[in-house]
From Swiss-Prot:
GO BP terms: mismatch repair
Domain of life: Bacteria
Family annotation (CDD domains): HATPase_MutL-MLH-PMS-like, MutL_Trans
UniProt organism field: Streptococcus pyogenes serotype M18 (strain MGAS8232)
Primary gene name: mutL
Family to which the UniProt record says this protein belongs: Belongs to the DNA mismatch repair MutL/HexB family.
Pfam family, one: DNA_mis_repair
One CC-aspect GO term: mismatch repair complex
Name recorded for this polypeptide: DNA mismatch repair protein MutL
Keyword check for DNA damage: yes
InterPro entries in UniProt: DNA_mismatch_repair_CS, DNA_mismatch_repair_MutL, DNA_mismatch_S5_2-like, HATPase_C_sf, MutL/Mlh/PMS, MutL/Mlh/Pms-like, MutL_C, MutL_C_dimsub
Function (record text): This protein is involved in the repair of mismatches in DNA. It is required for dam-dependent methyl-directed DNA mismatch repair. May act as a 'molecular matchmaker', a protein that promotes the formation of a stable complex between two or more DNA-binding proteins in an ATP-dependent manner without itself being part of a final effector complex.
UniProt-recorded Gene Ontology molecular function terms: ATP binding; ATP hydrolysis activity; ATP-dependent DNA damage sensor activity; mismatched DNA binding
Keywords (A to Z) from UniProt: DNA damage, DNA repair
């Protein structure tokens, strides 16, 4: 009797489903890709309970014949390849014939389909991979597939599902990627009767980007294009000022297929060069057209890993396309806009970019307890122009996005203010990059900060500054050199730590509320984590498509910090999966202290420098910044005398050494 048997087809399909169907988003991906391969121009995705209860995908594609319909549930049955040679010139998204039978084996599936050549369509109902009904019906041309009770016969998979909001965010991300890959298709995503995503299907990639990431983001995207004999590279990349805290906003498409490729990600970052801050990543949508012979998509059942021949040449092509596009842009006006934002409430741009040849110092305002740029340092008149409704400076040659038709009420400039994300204002040398995903390292840092004891700070007399970075002071113990960024980071950390920790019901009403735009998946994830934001005094309300509105802010947050501060808080939440309120408050204090501190290469006047040293002396631990770096170093009088050889290491005379 043989011990080796051929597994039943249903069991084999359930095993295959372990790789193909990881979560509800995997089902959406496979069904939508089949609809795209069927040459659909309209695809509607409807889900209930984040896809665990029901997923329905409706398209207006070619449909299936009555004879082909039952074959579609057979393993490795496909219409997309016929011979071995076809495997090397695949242009469809699917070809393995595994997805539909795998999905059918772990759910109840209902398929209605019809082709334009016949007068009637077909209905198929199957449960657990077993066909229960196959009959002729009247239905429009195209296919409608409904998947119900997903994972009903694989309870272990259900056990490891994340929350409904997290699973929904994955589905939104899948639909967004597919809509970017195929802007010629009109996508609609509906969850529990609520529309989450809708694209126009005009074929304009820029419009698709605007529909997903918002108009404000699209205005800061640059078009790129490059080609050689093997590859054609096109798409859009964000200006260096517009970045995110992770790679989730980097979309690479190969022949209409979203892929993950570390080397191509590296090529994108190389194209930006030193314009990107460490730990920040651009928003990118890059479409690569390639001969199928040069790409092997038959690597993994999910088909997200692709092996590409001449990968080094492709990397160089991408890097060159991005760097050349950035070279054409005059980035100076955006830097000046940053300066204007720090001194005026309105979002504005200067009329000209030439600055007077005089020192631009930082000064201290004791009433606001903060540093500021003296207004006389910039003598040009700055017209007040609303950020959203005003004209964009022509010196930044960025293609303007076409305004998409929107069903919502048009909001005037006097009713709300569109918040803009923080721009990169410090360098890698200011502080080590704070890795929010390294929970062990963060835990050690927070433990160290919690156990700090009160320190005694020496009395210092400030007398100068070097390179706009280091302060010089003298005390009874000798010379002290202070890192101004680390010093104010410590001062700000203890301020935010106390203020965020004692959040109460005291909120300041905003005369003009702020609007905050997010991508669909981030918008959903933030709704799930909103309680943490509420604990630190930030109350965001849903306001239209992928948008929150902020009507009030905690009294400890300065109004000029609201736009960048709230975005930074949200980005921080999105990077952490599970975090306690105590930990979030502590991490938030570290992040905000660094973002709000003066940076290197900024001159301080004498009053501001002395005031910084006074604030530092009042800190619980004035000797280290929150990251653990030293705030100051000391050269004693004896150290100085040794360096200048005013005293010898020992008492041996020069005559005894034979010098004289």
């Amino acid at each position: 009797m043989t011990n080796i048997i051929e597994l039943p087809e249903v069991l084999a399909n359930q095993i295959a489903a372990g790789e193909v169907v990881e979560r509800p988003a995997s089902v959406v991906k496979e069904l939508v890709e089949n609809a795209i391969d069927a040459k659909s121009s309209q695809i509607t995705v409807e889900i209930e309970e984040s896809g665990l209860k029901m997923i329905q995908v409706t398209d207006n594609g070619e449909g299936m014949s009555h004879e082909d319909l039952p074959l579609s549930l057979r393993r490795h049955a496909t219409s997309k390849i016929k011979s071995q040679s076809d495997l090397f010139r695949i242009r469809t998204l699917g070809f393995r014939g595994e997805a539909l039978p795998s999905v059918a084996s772990i759910s109840k599936i209902t398929i209605k389909t019809a082709t334009k050549e016949v007068t009637h369509g077909s209905l198929l109902i199957a449960t657990g991979g077993e066909i229960e009904t196959l009959e002729a019906i009247s239905t429009p041309t195209g296919t409608k597939i409904k998947v119900e009770n997903l994972f009903y016969n694989t309870p272990a998979r259900l056990k490891y599902m994340k929350s409904l909001q997290a699973e929904l965010a994955h589905i939104v991300d899948v639909v967004n990627r597919l809509s970017l890959a195929h802007p010629e298709v009109a996508f609609t995503l509906i969850s529990d009767g609520r529309q989450l995503t809708q694209t126009s299907g005009t074929g304009d990639l820029r419009q698709a980007i605007a529909g997903i990431y918002g108009l404000n983001t699209t205005k800061k995207m640059l078009v790129i294009s490059n080609a050689d004999l093997d590859f054609e590279v096109s798409g859009y990349v964000s200006l260096p000022e517009l970045t995110r805290a992770n790679r989730n906003y980097m979309t690479i498409l190969v022949n209409g297929r979203y892929i993950k490729n570390f080397l191509l990600n590296r090529a994108i970052l190389d194209g930006y060069g030193s314009k990107l801050m460490v730990g920040r990543f651009p928003i990118v949508v890059i479409d690569i057209q390639i001969d199928p012979y040069l790409a092997d998509v038959n690597v993994h059942p999910t088909k997200q890993e692709v092996r590409i021949s001449k990968e080094r040449e492709l990397m160089a092509l991408i890097s060159t396309a991005i760097s050349e596009s950035l070279k054409e842009q005059d980035l100076i006006p955006d830097a000046l806009e940053n300066l204007a934002k720090s001194s005026t409430r309105h979002f504005s741009k200067p009329e000209q970019t030439q600055l007077p040849l005089q020192s631009r110092g930082l000064y201290y305002d004791p009433q606001k307890n903060d540093f500021f740029v003296k207004e006389s340092a910039v003598s040009e008149k700055i017209p007040e122009t609303d950020f959203y409704f005003g004209a964009v400076d022509n010196s930044v040659k960025v293609e303007k996005a076409e305004l998409l038709p929107h069903s919502e009420e048009v909001i005037g400039p006097s009713s709300v203010k569109h918040a803009s994300r923080p721009q990169n204002t410090f360098t890698e040398t200011d502080h080590p990059n704070l890795d929010l995903k390294n929970r062990q390292k963060l835990s050690q840092m927070l433990t160290r900060l919690e156990n700090e004891e009160q320190s005694v700070f020496p009395e210092l007399d400030y007398f100068g500054q070097m390179h706009g970075t280091y302060l010089f002071a003298q005390g009874k113990d000798g010379l002290f050199i202070i890192d101004q960024h680390a010093a104010q980071e410590r001062v700000k950390y203890e301020y935010y730590r106390d203020k965020i920790g004692e959040v109460d019901s005291s909120l300041q009403q905003l005369l003009v509320p702020y609007l905050f735009e997010f991508s669909g998946s981030d918008f959903i994830n933030l709704q799930e984590k909103m309680a943490l934001l509420n604990e630190v005094g930030i109350f965001l309300e849903v306001y239209g498509h992928n948008t929150f509105i902020l009507r009030e802010h905690p009294i400890w947050m300065k109004e000029e910090e609201i736009a960048s501060g709230v975005y930074e808080m949200c980005d921080m939440l999105l990077l952490t999966n599970e975090v306690s309120i105590k930990t979030y408050r502590a991490e938030l204090a570290i992040m905000m202290s660094c973002k709000r501190s003066i940076k290197a290469n900024h001159s301080l006047d004498d009053y501001s420098a002395r005031n910084l040293l006074l604030q530092l002396a009042q800190c619980q631990n004035p000797y280290n910044c929150p990251h653990g770096r030293p705030v100051l170093i000391n050269f004693s009088k004896a150290d100085m005398e040794k360096m200048f050889r005013r005293i010898q290491e020992n008492h041996t005379s020069l005559r005894e050494l034979g010098k004289y």
